[in-house]
Amino acid sequence: MKVYLDAVSTTSLDPEVGKTYKKLLDEYYCNSDALYDDGVAIYAMQEKSRSIIADTFGVKKDEIIFTSGASEANSLAIKGLCFRHPERKHLITSIYEHSSVYNSFRQLEEEFGYDVTYLDPDKDGHISAEMVKDALRSETLLVSIMQVNNEIGAVNDVESIAEVVKKHPGTYFHTDITQGVGKVDVDLKNIDMASFSAHKIHGLKGSGVLIKKGFVNLSPIISGGQQEYGIRGGTSNALTNIVLAKTLRIAMENKDKYHDYLVQLHDQLIDGLKDTAKINYDKGLMTLVNISTPVQSEVMLNALNDKGIMVSSKSTCGSRKNELNRTLNALGIDENYALRISFDYTNSKEEIDYFLKTLKEILNKYA
């Protein structure tokens, strides 16, 4: 039996999305910037997708920038803003951001002389608006705080943070909403930039969006033609962009459709873990639980993998390198014994039972 419990890392492709994408691949291969009929048709479908995505988030069509994923979108938002406004050198982020955000700030700090304030989460795993307010300076250009943490599932009140930043002239607010799309609502009214990936919501890998309000000016990170309003050059991955609208629609529909079922899976998992593991965090995203066991994570991962169960011990973006887990370290959790379990509506109660039973067997053997 194979059980996939690493849904915050990536998700399976929705059958409807896959079917549409394959149909497009068979019928359309022309450049969407071409002026002949097939090129014009592809461009029109891409722009319709852009409009649907914009309507979903309550923004304007020209505020949707297609990218290769959230990592690129984060890099474009952060570096693109800094390179456009080099006169302001202070930035604010958190210590537990996704590596694409954190390492962008580190690069700006180490190679371009920026002064970066890294906020630590509170004991409940949150970055508050008050923390941001206290860190703001007259020369602060950008604040970037994620909506949902990908290691523990802590949900930050990014709307409140955005309100604080909005009152500070010349400062912009960016949030990575990758782990929240289709799970946690977000109001972008006061948020200047937001980014997400399709593959976290049963879409295609290599597909993402930067939502950038019209008044935000960025320098391109990828230079090229005038695609994506001149700030993201290169031939458009039009077919991927086209199916992203459908991916997002399905994710939003499933948010309510499967809510009660996901609550049941969550409660089943928590009840089964109480006697076998220490629950490090269960105060945020209900589909993500971080636990510790008496057995080292590497041993647990291999033992679970041998039984067909896939979980993580850290963010996949840092899993093949010996990188310090900034999130767990900030909360005083020993990463050497921690496991991240995440699920979605494609998982069954039988799979959760199998995981709990197998976990207990492994602990009885190694603990």
Tell where the protein language model's regions lie, with residue ranges.
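Pyridoxal 5′-phosphate
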Residues: M1-A367
